Regions:
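Terminal, low-structured helical/coil segments at or just beyond the last alpha-helical repeat
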Residues: 1-5, 163-207
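Register position in tetratricopeptide repeats
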Residues: 17-18, 51-54, 86, 121, ...
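Hydrophobic/aromatic packing residues within the alpha-helices of TPR/SEL1-like helical repeat arrays
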Residues: 28, 62-65, 97, 132, ...
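Short coil turns that delineate tetratricopeptide repeat
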Residues: 36, 70-71, 105-106, 140, ...
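Alpha-solenoid helical repeat scaffolds
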Residues: 40-44, 74-79, 109-114, 144-148, ...
């Protein structure tokens, strides 16, 4: 057995959305007890541990999975890249994400988002920002993509573009998709970004 029954997947995903990670892990572990090499279950463990910020445990799970698949599974490579990002290992993360991106023909906005961030923080700022823009074109309703674009525009001192993205967020916040963070998180952060931009403009006027 390689897969998880659909009804159990729905239950696990619902528990993850409710942040009931321990309950989700219990269900996944019951599957792994019967089938220790169940690839979907191993991926679920990696994802849940990542959401719990248990990076080491998530790393072990995804390494085991990738070894089983000879490092040829885009989802496993994406998760491995994500975990390396959390450790600020931009070079290694970039390697895994690039392979995942190539295997999915650059069609997955989340892989593009993460790869773009890796390139940016590795020092290839223009290239990284370009991939974030591509991610936004593919899915303009992902709150994290919008948030990252605002961040990078501010870092690049492109305040007009940052403000445009802030306006976009405020206009579309009720229809945006949120995964690991809730709306309040983004509203608080983006409000601070907006105040920063206004302060910069005021400072420039006074100069």
């Amino acid at each position: 057995m390689v897969y998880i029954p659909e009804e159990l997947i729905d239950e696990i995903e619902e528990l993850k959305e409710l942040w009931k990670y321990d309950e989700a892990i219990r269900i996944v572990n019951s599957i792994l007890m019967r089938d220790p090499k169940n690839e979907d279950a191993i991926l679920q463990i990696a994802d849940i541990q990542y959401r719990k910020w248990e990076i080491g445990k998530a790393d072990k799970a995804v390494d085991f999975l990738n070894a089983q698949k000879n490092n040829n599974d885009p989802l496993g490579l994406y998760i491995k890249g994500l975990l390396e990002m959390e450790k600020n290992n931009w070079k290694d993360a970039r390697k895994y994400l690039l392979k995942a991106m190539e295997m999915t023909n650059a069609s997955n906005h989340e892989i593009l988002r993460c790869y773009g961030l890796c390139e940016y923080w590795y020092g290839n700022r223009e290239k990284g920002l370009s991939f974030l823009k591509d991610a936004f074109v593919i899915d303009n309703k992902d709150a994290e993509v919008v948030y990252n674009l605002i961040q990078l525009y501010i870092l690049e001192q492109e305040y007009k573009k940052a403000q445009e993205m802030i306006s976009y967020f405020n206009k579309n916040k009720d229809s945006l998709k949120f995964v690991d963070k809730e709306l309040d998180f983004y509203q608080t952060k983006i409000s601070l970004f907006e105040k920063f931009i206004k302060a910069k403009k005021l400072f420039q006027i006074r100069k």
